[in-house]
């Protein structure tokens, strides 16, 4: 435990918070334009073709972001909304595209967890 004198001389060191999504610059989401839409394979124990997009954000930073859900309508020059959130089995993918916002359509025929995939409520 430090003495009063030591605290006066040095003070307490502030804990520096490191952002998990630095390209968003402390914003909850950012708009961007898709520069490339492609599929990639995950890390070792898993096997799939994961849909990802390279997105140039409005602040000029280019990031790789994941396209969640089954099927998508994105192509080059699509305007998308990007949020933070990494994909554990895709190295370098630290962002998600928000479905149902801007040019990204919601997932078709989805009944559960609709809000996460931008799907409207089905008609009775």
Curated annotation (Swiss-Prot):
<comment type="function">
    <text>With S4 and S5 plays an important role in translational accuracy.</text>
</comment>
<feature type="modified residue" description="3-methylthioaspartic acid">
    <location>
        <position position="89"/>
    </location>
</feature>
<keyword id="KW-0699">rRNA-binding</keyword>
<dbReference type="GO" id="GO:0000049">
    <property type="term" value="F:tRNA binding"/>
</dbReference>
<protein>
    <recommendedName>
        <fullName>Small ribosomal subunit protein uS12</fullName>
    </recommendedName>
</protein>
<dbReference type="GO" id="GO:0019843">
    <property type="term" value="F:rRNA binding"/>
</dbReference>
<dbReference type="InterPro" id="IPR006032">
    <property type="entry name" value="Ribosomal_uS12"/>
</dbReference>
<dbReference type="GO" id="GO:0015935">
    <property type="term" value="C:small ribosomal subunit"/>
</dbReference>
<keyword id="KW-0488">Methylation</keyword>
<comment type="subunit">
    <text>Part of the 30S ribosomal subunit. Contacts proteins S8 and S17. May interact with IF1 in the 30S initiation complex.</text>
</comment>
<comment type="similarity">
    <text>Belongs to the universal ribosomal protein uS12 family.</text>
</comment>
<dbReference type="InterPro" id="IPR005679">
    <property type="entry name" value="Ribosomal_uS12_bac"/>
</dbReference>
<keyword id="KW-0687">Ribonucleoprotein</keyword>
<keyword id="KW-0694">RNA-binding</keyword>
<dbReference type="GO" id="GO:0006412">
    <property type="term" value="P:translation"/>
</dbReference>
<feature type="region of interest" description="Disordered">
    <location>
        <begin position="104"/>
        <end position="124"/>
    </location>
</feature>
<keyword id="KW-0689">Ribosomal protein</keyword>
<comment type="function">
    <text>Interacts with and stabilizes bases of the 16S rRNA that are involved in tRNA selection in the A site and with the mRNA backbone. Located at the interface of the 30S and 50S subunits, it traverses the body of the 30S subunit contacting proteins on the other side and probably holding the rRNA structure together. The combined cluster of proteins S8, S12 and S17 appears to hold together the shoulder and platform of the 30S subunit.</text>
</comment>
<dbReference type="GO" id="GO:0003735">
    <property type="term" value="F:structural constituent of ribosome"/>
</dbReference>
<dbReference type="Pfam" id="PF00164">
    <property type="entry name" value="Ribosom_S12_S23"/>
</dbReference>
<keyword id="KW-0820">tRNA-binding</keyword>
<dbReference type="InterPro" id="IPR012340">
    <property type="entry name" value="NA-bd_OB-fold"/>
</dbReference>
<feature type="compositionally biased region" description="Basic residues">
    <location>
        <begin position="111"/>
        <end position="124"/>
    </location>
</feature>
